[in-house]
């Protein structure tokens, strides 16, 4: 029995030293940063050496028992035959005392004792006290209240049950704070309980907006921090679950192990402040609000730069003796800031060697006694690429030589230059970023700087209450990085269309109507208009502070009801700007939303500017407003009252200059966005910043703000949605697409599609406008499927197809890197996932729960056919009673019948040829008859055999099992022969029962194949009816006179002959066609059967009916020809599950000189890496384990590699550490490693599970699963009689000590009972020859055709 062992992990993990051995297959271990060989005393005082082993002359190994008090959260992890921990099982709070056992290696080299430790282990999990909470989570998860979005942080900060145990006893009495809203959302997710959405409004527009998507409120943003930390999750306290799956993650975000960064405030001291050093104390820094201290180092003379890179260190002034009274000293809380100068470095950083020389010199400054390094370099646009290369190379050097030093960078926050930074590169290189203020303070006292990590899950806005320099830039950077950290640029943010309604208010006063904001104008950051970085503050009168609603900070001071201001309140919009065009665009956007009244009373946000800058702001706003108000009035005049008139927008702006602008800002009021003229066309003014179709956000209506996921397009006032919302209409020619008019949208209430009304079908193209639903473009032709307006009515129009078959192809209108199918994302190119990349291969079906189904083809066909001499001519039929006198009269009557007889003869010959073809196919399928060398069936013996099918040894067991459903094995035929000879009497006794069963089976078979039999019977009945009717008519006519009777008799005889010939021709032609179709079907079917498929065979089995594509898969397990029937046994799955299938490419291994890619063909199914699938079309067998790749993970020496920068369309740049694929650049954290180290030491292990494969047993109960398309009469009573006879026979055979056939008879009876159990009463191959003989005897009686008399003798 295995020994259960526990251990604790403290992040970051410290893995065991080389050479460590673990005796057990499964261990739980402890690894902590403080156990580094130098702090053994921190374990406690009860460390005891329990044993020692001499390893060599210098090293000794001891087993040490000790106790350890956790200083932070401890993680209990389990590992199986690996040093890599991926899943943790317990979480221990700080202060927990643990009993440990650890192997320590002590060195006495050079008389200096040093220690090295393997991984500490706890051998008894029951010793963990109640402060260690059992739970499952990823060991790499970060615990952070500020970014508490992963499973571990949800457990700590979201669960009420665990707050006490984990030392978190705070409660949320003020639900309007951001922290309480986060706790409320996380608690709802953790406990799967409903939550009041109104308590979460404060999260909108923040870094935690994405939490709302997990709760079913709105839609999760694809590049949100929630996906990185929470991953796929379902929340379903109500009837309908809300699930965020991998299919909704279009960028394949790969979580990186980012080091946590404190969000405190740093202080900078200039290098020339050495005369002030004696006065710098810890108290002074605390008074200034400093958490860390940085010494700034400058070039001695920026205008006299070093001549070479080697002289760089000599030209930097940085005091090495700097100390602050009260601080612990250099290294712990001290940092170094290097100020670069573009002019001084431009000639020294062009080559990689020069940059490496400078980097080496940087780390030599101050003798490495600092814990953080900040590069203060604002490059020119020409040096920006060089700057990125320099930072990447600096980070690589740091990771190798100084991994404990944190790296930061100072960047500019000015727009538009900030958008030029490569934040995807910097986010993987630096730990924090500082904004360079526009006004640089010149002081020798400590000045504040505010660090900010460049991660979308931890975007801070500086610290506004600390008054950090450059605070405006921090706020702009918040928005810039939200776009630029994604995998697409801001101008391409058109993944979806959210419909948001802005909350407006209107106050009617004596002199005017005033529109005002009731919510933040820019509460959602989704459109390209944010690129210049202005932010809106909503200001209430008589307030001491501005309420900032841009998502970075909550409300300071008392709670304010900003949504419902007082009646006499006048709101103000404060704008931050960096250039006049920002303000102009803001005015454009406001006017497009209906704002026509502006009041300029000052400037907000320019707290760092002087009075001249404030004056410039006022002047710029005034000019922007007056010019646009004048343009607004001109466009109003051009629009007129009759709807949308033709106008040239560029001409208007060319004519409207600052000199023509009116002096007042109270110009004519803007018409409402949804006001319609007589023709029903929505009038809008297309300002340059107005909301247009195709942008990623549209604000409409007068109700509260709402988000409708699933809206995919907005064209000409029509909304198209993939989700069925109340108020939308269904389209009849396009499923899963719904449409409504924009002005009618009042809410986002999802309903069932069938509950929506169907849109009206128009008979012509809509006259107002028509939108092609394939391209969402406006068209005017009649060859498109369109939706549009006919007057004021919403209608659809389908093209009038003039030919019998029409194929309409949609032209390609755009290219994108992914497509959506049923609301899921599928990629057209590679994308990164954990440990590799995936390339979509499509959606395939995987089968399970296989059963046997049986079908058969009957070759026993009865057809009526006539030889040409047996069909009398027209003259012989008409003149049969009086040949001499009738013939001259009938000649004229019958001289047109040659063509009629010719048609009949052709049809008759066609039928004969079809029967010959059928007989030929019949002879072909006899190859599936029992083997000729076996037992020859006789009237009193059962003839059973195995179909002769060629197969591989691997398929032999399965095929034998399939044949057992239809027959016994051929190897038993010879052994049964002697016993069969002694069973004649028993067979005779069973004959009557078998005959009865055969009769019932015949009736069912006739029901299936009786179409020809019924045809024959109908012809005979028609002939009999005609014979009787004409005889009666002839008898009555004789009374009118002999002459008249003869004439009428001749006419009626002709009519009867004509009708019979027409009927026979028609029936024979139909028979020929039916037989011809059957011959073609059989010929195609046999070809498919020989290939092992049912592709060309008719079948009514449910698996084939529901999935026709399954017929192309090799499902045929047995074929047997018997008694003019070909029986087909298929093995098909009862369940077919659709799964996403992707090609998997493992991540490469990066060395200093090479990029090596594991060379394996792998697939990715359900999040697992598997071997290549065995598929036919879209139908696949269950995935199997990739044993060779697993062996590579377990033993890297067995791996196959292909080395090179590019592999299968994916390239790696060793300088920037970027993974480049066809449609994007992905920063994929790949560590530099040595070729001698394990190549996959960071990849979670794959546990190999061997499946127990048992021999397939031919259990008779399997017959209960037979599924057939033929349904037959119940023969239970007949079977009961047979049971008694068989039991008597078994008893007699037992007396004779003869076994085998009696057991087979028992097998036979239970096989029939198994068929009865599922209602499919068909004997198939289990029936005896006597059964078929009886069936043949009954068939001869049932199918005997009525003899044909000469046509002229029928009346």
Curated annotation (Swiss-Prot):
Indicate where this protein resides in the cell.
Answer: Host membrane
Signal sequence residues:
1-16
Enumerate the Pfam families for this protein.
Answer: Spike_torovirin
Q: Which residues are glycosylated?
A: 81, 112, 129, 169, 173, 192, 542, 655, 682, 744, 780, 811, 815, 860, 865, 882, 895, 1213, 1225, 1267, 1274
From which residue to which does any coiled coil extend? 1245-1299
GO CC annotation: host cell membrane; membrane
- InterPro entries given in the database record: S_torovirinae
Q: How does it sit in the membrane?
A: Single-pass membrane protein
Q: Which source organism does the UniProt entry give?
A: Ictalurid herpesvirus 1 (strain Auburn) (IcHV-1)
Task: Print the keywords alphabetically.
Answer: Coiled coil, Glycoprotein, Host membrane, Membrane, Signal, Transmembrane, Transmembrane helix
Transmembrane regions listed in the UniProt entry: 1308-1328
Presence of keyword Chaperone: no
Q: What is this protein called?
A: Probable major glycoprotein
What is the superkingdom listed in this entry's lineage?
Viruses
């Amino acid at each position: 029995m295995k020994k259960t062992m526990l251990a604790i992990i403290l992040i970051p993990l410290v893995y065991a030293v080389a050479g460590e051995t673990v005796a057990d297959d499964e261990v739980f271990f402890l690894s902590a940063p403080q156990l580094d060989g130098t702090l053994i005393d921190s374990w406690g005082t009860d460390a005891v050496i329990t044993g020692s082993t001499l390893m060599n002359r210098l090293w000794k190994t001891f087993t040490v028992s000790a106790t350890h008090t956790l200083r932070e959260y401890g993680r209990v992890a389990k590992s199986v035959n690996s040093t890599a921990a991926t899943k943790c099982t317990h979480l221990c709070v700080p202060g927990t005392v643990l009993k440990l056992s650890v192997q320590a290696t002590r060195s006495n080299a050079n008389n200096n004792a040093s220690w090295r430790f393997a991984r500490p282990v706890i051998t008894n999990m029951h010793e963990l006290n109640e402060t260690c909470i059992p739970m499952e989570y990823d060991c790499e998860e970060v615990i952070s209240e500020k970014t508490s979005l992963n499973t571990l942080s949800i457990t700590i900060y979201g669960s009420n049950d665990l707050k006490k145990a984990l030392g978190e006893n705070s409660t949320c009495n003020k639900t309007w704070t951001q922290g309480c809203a986060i706790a409320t959302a996380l608690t709802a997710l953790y406990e799967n309980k409903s939550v009041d959405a109104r308590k979460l409004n404060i999260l909108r527009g923040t870094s935690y907006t994405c939490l709302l998507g997990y709760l079913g409120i709105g839609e999760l943003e694809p590049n949100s921090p929630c996906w990185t930390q929470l991953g796929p999750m379902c929340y379903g306290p109500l009837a309908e679950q809300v699930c965020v799956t991998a299919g909704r993650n279009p960028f394949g975000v790969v979580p990186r192990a980012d080091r946590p960064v404190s969000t405190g405030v740093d202080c900078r001291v200039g290098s020339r402040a050495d005369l002030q050093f004696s006065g710098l104390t810890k108290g002074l820094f605390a008074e200034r609000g400093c958490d860390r201290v940085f010494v700034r180092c400058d070039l001695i003379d920026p205008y006299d730069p070093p001549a070479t890179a080697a002289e760089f260190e000599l030209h930097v002034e940085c005091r090495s003796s700097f100390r602050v009274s009260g601080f612990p000293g250099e290294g712990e809380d001290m940092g170094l800031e290097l100020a670069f100068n573009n002019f001084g470095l431009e000639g020294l950083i062009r080559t990689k060697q020069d940059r490496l020389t400078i980097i080496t010199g940087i780390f030599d400054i101050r003798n490495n006694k600092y814990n953080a390094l900040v590069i203060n370099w604002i490059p020119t646009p020409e040096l920006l690429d060089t700057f990125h290369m320099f930072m990447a190379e600096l980070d690589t050097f740091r990771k190798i030589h100084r991994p404990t030093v944190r790296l930061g960078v100072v960047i500019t926050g000015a727009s538009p230059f900030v958008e030029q930074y490569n934040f995807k590169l910097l986010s993987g290189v630096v730990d924090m970023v500082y904004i360079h203020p526009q006004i640089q303070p010149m002081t020798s006292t400590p000045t504040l700087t505010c660090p900010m990590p460049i991660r979308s899950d931890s975007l801070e806005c500086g610290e506004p209450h600390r008054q950090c320099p450059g605070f405006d830039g921090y706020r702009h950077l918040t928005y810039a990085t939200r776009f630029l950290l994604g995998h697409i640029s801001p101008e391409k943010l058109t993944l979806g269309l959210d419909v948001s309604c802005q909350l407006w208010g209107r106050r009617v006063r004596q002199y005017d109507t005033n529109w005002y904001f009731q919510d933040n104008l820019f509460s959602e950051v989704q459109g390209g208009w944010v690129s210049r970085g202005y932010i809106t503050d909503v200001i209430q009168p008589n307030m001491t502070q501005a309420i900032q609603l841009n998502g970075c900070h909550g409300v300071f001071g008392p709670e304010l009801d900003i949504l419902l201001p007082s009646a006499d309140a006048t709101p103000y919009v404060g704008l931050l700007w960096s250039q006049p065009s920002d303000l102009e665009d803001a005015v454009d956007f406001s006017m497009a939303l209906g704002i026509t009244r502006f009041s300029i009373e000052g400037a907000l946000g320019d707290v760092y500017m002087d009075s001249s800058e404030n004056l410039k702001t006022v002047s710029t706003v005034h000019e922007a407003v007056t010019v646009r108000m004048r343009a607004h009035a001109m466009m109003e005049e051009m629009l007129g009252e009759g709807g949308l008139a033709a106008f040239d927008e560029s001409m208007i702006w060319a004519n409207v200059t600052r000199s023509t602008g009116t002096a007042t800002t109270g110009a004519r009021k803007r018409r409402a966005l949804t006001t319609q003229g007589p023709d029903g066309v929505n009038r809008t003014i297309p300002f340059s910043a107005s909301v247009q179709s195709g942008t990623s956000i549209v604000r409409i209506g007068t109700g509260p703000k709402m988000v409708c996921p699933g809206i995919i397009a907005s064209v000409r006032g029509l909304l198209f949605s993939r989700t069925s919302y109340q108020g939308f209409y269904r389209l009849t020619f396009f499923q899963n697409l719904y449409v409504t008019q924009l002005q009618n949208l009042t809410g986002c209430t999802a309903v069932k599609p069938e509950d929506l009304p169907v849109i009206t079908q128009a008979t012509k193209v809509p006259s107002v406008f028509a939108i092609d639903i394939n391209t969402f473009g406006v068209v005017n032709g009649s060859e498109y499927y369109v939706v549009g307006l006919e007057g004021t009515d919403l209608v659809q129009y389908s093209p009038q197809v003039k030919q019998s078959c029409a194929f309409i192809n949609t032209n390609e209108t755009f290219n994108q890197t992914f497509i959506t199918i049923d609301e899921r994302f599928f990629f057209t190119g590679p994308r990164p996932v954990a440990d590799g990349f995936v390339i979509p291969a499509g959606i395939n079906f995987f089968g399970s729960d296989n059963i046997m189904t049986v079908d058969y083809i009957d070759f026993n066909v009865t057809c009526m056919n006539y030889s040409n001499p047996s069909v009398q001519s027209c003259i012989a039929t008409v003149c049969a009673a009086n040949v001499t006198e009738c013939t001259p009269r009938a000649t004229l009557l019958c001289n047109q019948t040659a063509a009629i007889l010719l048609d009949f003869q052709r049809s008759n010959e066609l039928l004969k040829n079809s029967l010959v073809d059928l007989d030929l196919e019949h002879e072909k399928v006899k190859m599936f008859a029992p083997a000729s060398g076996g037992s020859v069936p006789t009237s009193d013996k059962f003839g059973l055999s195995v179909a002769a099918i060629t197969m591989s040894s691997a398929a032999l067991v399965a095929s034998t099992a399939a044949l057992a459903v239809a027959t016994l094995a051929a190897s038993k035929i010879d052994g049964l022969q002697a016993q069969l000879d002694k069973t004649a009497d028993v067979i005779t006794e069973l004959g009557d029962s078998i005959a009865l069963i055969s009769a019932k089976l015949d009736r069912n078979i006739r029901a299936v194949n009786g179409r020809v039999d019924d045809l024959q019977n109908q012809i005979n009945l028609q002939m009999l009816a005609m014979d009787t009717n004409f005889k009666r008519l002839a008898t009555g006519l004789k009374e009118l006179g002999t002459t008249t009777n003869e004439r009428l008799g001749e006419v009626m005889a002709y009519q009867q002959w004509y009708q019979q010939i027409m009927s026979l021709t028609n029936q024979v032609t139909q028979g020929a066609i039916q037989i011809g179709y059957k011959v073609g079907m059989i010929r195609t079917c046999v070809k498919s059967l020989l290939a092992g498929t049912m592709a060309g065979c008719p079948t009514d089995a449910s698996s084939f009916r529901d999935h026709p594509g399954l017929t192309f898969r090799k499902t045929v397990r047995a074929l047997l020809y018997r008694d003019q029937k070909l029986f087909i046994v298929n093995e098909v799955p009862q369940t077919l599950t659709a799964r996403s299938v992707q090609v998997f490419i493992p991540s490469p291994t990066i060395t200093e000189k090479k990029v090596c890619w594991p060379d394996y063909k792998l697939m990715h199914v359900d999040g697992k890496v598997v071997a290549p699938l065995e598929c036919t079309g879209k139908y696949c067998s269950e995935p199997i384990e990739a044993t060779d790749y697993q062996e590579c993970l377990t033993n890297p020496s067995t791996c196959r590699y292909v080395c090179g920068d590019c592999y299968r369309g994916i390239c790696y740049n060793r300088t920037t550490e970027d993974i480049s694929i066809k449609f994007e650049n992905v920063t994929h954290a790949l560590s530099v490693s040595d070729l001698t180290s394990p190549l996959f030491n960071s990849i979670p292990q794959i546990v190999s599970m061997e499946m127990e494969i048992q021999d397939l047993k031919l259990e008779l109960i399997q017959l209960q699963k037979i599924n057939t398309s033929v349904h037959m009469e119940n023969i239970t009573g007949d079977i009961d009689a047979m049971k008694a006879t068989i039991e008597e026979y078994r008893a007699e055979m037992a007396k004779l000590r003869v076994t085998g056939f009696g057991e087979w008879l028992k097998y036979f009876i239970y096989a029939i009972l198994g068929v009865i159990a599922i209602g499919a009463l068909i004997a198939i191959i289990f029936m005896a020859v006597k059964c078929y003989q009886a069936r043949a005897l009954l068939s001869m009686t049932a199918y005997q055709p009525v003899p044909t008399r000469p046509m002229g003798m029928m009346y």
